[in-house]
Amino acid sequence: MATNGENGRHQEVGHKSLLQSDALYQYILETSVYPREPEPMKELREITAKHPWNIMTTSADEGQFLSMLLKLINAKNTMEIGVFTGYSLLATAMALPDDGKILAMDINRDNYEIGLPVIEKAGLAHKIEFKEGPALPVLDQMIEDGKYHGSYDFIFVDADKDNYLNYHKRLIDLVKVGGLIGYDNTLWNGSVVAPPDAPLRKYVRYYRDFVLELNKALAADSRIEICQLPVGDGITLCRRIS
């Protein structure tokens, strides 16, 4: 049973884990995640912790999960929409083979450049093509081009929740049959089951309906198999089957 302190902590919107016990989450981190976390990822995690918007970063346990997943599917050509300081990007770059590629897009290059020295020091910058600006125009151009259809093994989306469905409409053509798309924050701080009068922060309440709409659409999409996991803030994996 959670203590009162743990209950209080989990009422805070910024808490990254959906587990009902802080002690249990810390056990996972300290037993299985931090001891195996590569030094570059630890360095970037500690740098990002000083950022005023550090809640935007991918959690360490989710980074570990993504790394394992990428290796299991032998991913080589990947895309990331929403980079922030690059923790999940670094996890991806470390998991890919030396000739692996990541197209990374974010509207804020300044945040990306916080983590870039760590990525460069790890000898992984050659795997990354970073584009600053909205992702939708880039995706539209790729679809129009034609040669990118079905070319991606894995795509990770951790960006503007109000555009998740717009991303999905395009990404389904760019990921290969058998490839995966991962949508982050699909449990959105647990707000997806919150009652209408729940005390939610404004940004959580604003994006909640978009996340609910996405979850409903993914569940009904016959082109994919899905698996929604309570890792981090919730991640939904979509495997393209047609």
UniProtKB/Swiss-Prot annotation:
The keyword Metal-binding applies. Pathway: Aromatic compound metabolism; phenylpropanoid biosynthesis. This is Caffeoyl-CoA O-methyltransferase 3. InterPro entries: Cation-dep_OMT, SAM-dependent_MTases_sf, SAM_O-MeTrfase. Its EC number is 2.1.1.104. Mostly expressed in the bottom and middle parts of the stems. PROSITE patterns: SAM_OMT_I (PS51682). The lineage of its organism: Eukaryota, Viridiplantae, Streptophyta, Embryophyta, Tracheophyta. Coiled coil: none annotated.
